[in-house]
Amino acid sequence: MANSSPVYDWFQERLEIQDIADDVTSKYVPPHVNIFYCLGGITLVCFLIQFATGFAMTFYYKPTVTEAYNSVSYLMTDVSFGWLIRSVHRWSASMMVLMLILHVFRVYLTGGFKRPRELTWVTGVVMAVITVAFGVTGYSLPWDQVGYWAVKIVSGVPAAIPVVGDFMVELLRGGESVGQTTLTRFYSLHTFVLPWTLAIFMLMHFLMIRKQGISGPL
């Protein structure tokens, strides 16, 4: 690069950052690609917003059955811009689900799931399931009447599964009934297990797209 700085030269000599930049910026984009091919990227942006706003809320949220509701109320009424942070979190959650659904339809209608992109489709389906799990676990965290009964109903659904149903219910609830252990498990899932699992599958998803390229037109 002409007129490069000493700092740039130092990194270029060791990491060859220009080659990386050229690879990222010079990828061929097929002429049939339109705005509907951006739905996956918009879903990623929504996830990043979720991550940032969710991280901000962890400074104030208290995952106990006695303090969860009051901590959310405090965030909404007393914390500067707390209402905005939580509202953006909720809006981006809805937007993420909507963009995910539209993205799945686009991929299906354009045949993006066909050979050799079957694994890309599989990772996408897994991420869709994780996104739904995000909604279920996040819905319970305010621990109000809606959240409590939602958890009770959802965690009781596996009881209909033969043999392992009762075990799965107890695993989700942390006991025979819904209580503090249930809230703790849902909080851990929502703030740690699910985000990192989704991030791993996103990385796999993007690497496969990067390797195989965008599918052709029908």
Curated annotation (Swiss-Prot):
The chain crosses the membrane at residues 35-55, 93-113, 119-139, 189-209. Coiled coil: none annotated. GO terms for cellular component: plasma membrane-derived thylakoid membrane. It is found in: Cellular thylakoid membrane. Heme b 2 binds at H89, H190. It is a multi-pass membrane protein. It holds the Pfam family Cytochrome_B. The 4 large subunits of the cytochrome b6-f complex are cytochrome b6, subunit IV (17 kDa polypeptide, PetD), cytochrome f and the Rieske protein, while the 4 small subunits are PetG, PetL, PetM and PetN. The complex functions as a dimer. Component of the cytochrome b6-f complex, which mediates electron transfer between photosystem II (PSII) and photosystem I (PSI), cyclic electron flow around PSI, and state transitions. This is Cytochrome b6.
